[in-house]
Curated annotation (Swiss-Prot):
UniProt keywords, alphabetically: Cilium biogenesis/degradation, Coated pit, Coiled coil, Membrane
Coiled coil spans: 75-98
Record flagged with keyword Membrane: yes
Name of this chain's protein: Coiled-coil domain-containing protein 32
Record organism: Mus musculus (Mouse)
Any one of the GO BP annotations: regulation of clathrin-dependent endocytosis
Keyword Coiled coil among UniProt keywords: yes
One Pfam family named in its UniProt record: CCDC32
Location of the region described as Disordered in the Swiss-Prot/TrEMBL record: 36-65, 158-179
Principal place of residence: membrane
GO CC terms in record: clathrin-coated pit
Gene that specifies this protein: Ccdc32
UniProt-listed InterPro entries: CCDC32
UniProt subunit comment: Interacts with AP2S1; the interaction is direct and mediates association with adaptor protein complex 2 (AP-2).
Length: 179
C-alpha cells in the first residue's frame, strides 16, 4: 500500500494535475479547447480495455457500430403493460367466460319472461295449427312451473277425494236444520 511520500515537499501541484494522476481518463486542457463543448456522447463505453486515451477520444466522435434496434419482445412487453393499465383503470375490453355466461343467463331470462307475458298464441305456434288457452298454459307450466298460476282443475286434483265428499254432507246438514 502506497502512502503519501512527499507530504512535506515544497512543490505544489495544481488540482488538474492531481486529478490527471488519479483519473487518466480526463482529457487534457488542449483537447478541451479544440472541442467546442458540443454534446456528443453515444452512451457507449468510451474506453474499452486495452485502448489508449487518444483512440478513445476519436471513437467518441464516431457513430456507434450498431444502430439501435428494438428488442424482439419489446412490443409484447408494451402490450402487456397497456393491458395491465386498462385492467387497473377498469377499461378492460376482454370478455371473460364468466361475463359471457352472465350475459347469456340474463338474455335467457329476458326471453322467457317475454314469452310468458305474451298473450297471443299465434306468435308461439306455426300458423294453421289450432291452439287454445289451455294448451298454451300447459306449455308454459311445463317450461316454468313457478311462473304460472295453478288452475281450478289442478286444485281439485290436489284436494283429496275424502275431503270433497265431506263438504257436500256438511252443506246438507245446515240446509236441513233451516227447514
Amino acid at each position: 500500500m502506497k502512502m503519501f511520500e512527499s507530504l512535506d515537499s515544497s512543490a505544489t501541484k495544481s488540482g488538474r494535475d492531481l486529478w490527471a494522476e488519479i483519473c487518466s481518463c480526463l482529457p487534457s486542457p488542449a483537447q478541451e479547447d479544440v472541442s467546442d463543448n458540443a454534446f456528443s456522447d453515444s452512451f457507449m463505453d468510451s474506453h474499452p480495455a486495452g485502448e489508449s486515451h487518444t483512440a478513445a477520444a476519436d471513437s467518441a466522435v464516431q457513430p456507434a457500430g450498431k444502430p439501435w434496434a428494438p428488442l424482439h419482445d419489446s412490443e409484447v412487453y408494451l402490450a402487456s403493460l397497456e393491458k395491465k393499465l386498462r385492467r387497473i383503470k377498469g377499461l378492460n375490453e376482454e370478455v371473460t367466460s364468466k361475463d359471457m355466461l352472465r350475459t347469456l343467463a340474463q338474455a335467457k331470462k329476458e326471453c322467457w319472461d317475454r314469452f310468458l307475458q305474451e298473450k297471443l298464441a299465434s306468435e308461439f305456434f306455426v300458423d294453421g295449427l289450432d291452439s287454445d288457452e289451455r294448451t298454451l298454459e300447459h306449455f308454459k307450466r311445463w317450461l316454468q312451473p313457478d311462473k304460472v298460476a295453478i288452475s281450478t282443475e289442478e286444485v281439485q286434483f290436489l284436494i283429496p277425494p275424502e275431503s270433497q265428499a265431506e263438504k257436500p254432507e256438511a252443506g246438507d246438514k245446515p240446509a236441513a236444520a233451516e227447514q
